[in-house]
Amino acid sequence: MFIEQPARWLRWLYPKATWRMDKNVRAIYLTFDDGPIPEATPFILDTLKEHGAKATFFMVGDNVKKHPELYERIVAEGHQVGNHTMNHIGGFRHWTTTYIINTYQANELIHAHLFRPPHGWMRHSPYYWLSKYYKVVMWDVVTRDYSTRLTAEEVLENVKRYTRNGSIITFHDSLKSIGKLHYALPEALKWLKEQGYEFRTFE
């Protein structure tokens, strides 16, 4: 999605999904999609640890299979894990059965009760089935750290501009994002703490 906050029509498509947490609590929920990979995950974990922050990692099963030591480190350091399918497959390019099987294959490695669809969307049929067994977590703020059109400073500005109580903030644990995260992530964590936000993970 090329938007920092989801449109109302998108929220309407997935009414059972979680888009934002309690707006009356000064807390936010950090999420990282697409990892784990050795080029990005260690830096993210080190930075989170330095700032005393916990996050939820929506991981691709194939990456977990390739880098089990990173999965183990994420869990050992007290972060939450979520399913992001086995092969980061698009929700509109595959049959429902294929999509669900791919998700279940990933969960044999990830062992999660949380799910986020790659690219933030999927057909209604897999959504219907997966929402029976997973808590489907979407987002309230997309930092767009993956965009080649944005600078690291602009990624940080997206966090500052759109974050509010209960925001689910999406970063990416990926090659496309890591260059910007070296600056944007520590600065974002510092700013969030200065604003009095508590870092939380999902039940």
Task: List where the protein language model places each region.
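Charged helix-capping and loop-helix junction motifs
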Residues: 69-72, 96-103, 151-157, 182-186
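A cross-domain feature marking catalytic cores of carbohydrate-active enzymes
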Residues: 32-34, 59-62, 83-85, 117-119, ...
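A short, conserved beta-to-alpha structural element at the edge of catalytic cores
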Residues: 50-77
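His/Asp/Glu-enriched short active-site or ligand-binding loop at hydrolase and phosphoryl-transfer sites
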Residues: 113, 121, 126-160, 196-203
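Catalytic grooves of carbohydrate-active enzymes
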Residues: 159-203
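CE4/NodB-like, metal-dependent polysaccharide N-deacetylase domain
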Residues: 45-54, 79-80, 86, 96-124, ...
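Acidic-and-aromatic substrate-binding clefts and catalytic sites of carbohydrate-active enzymes
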Residues: 35-39, 58-67, 89-97, 116-123, ...
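N-terminal pre-catalytic segment of deacetylase/amide-hydrolase enzymes
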Residues: 1-31, 36-51, 66-67, 187-203
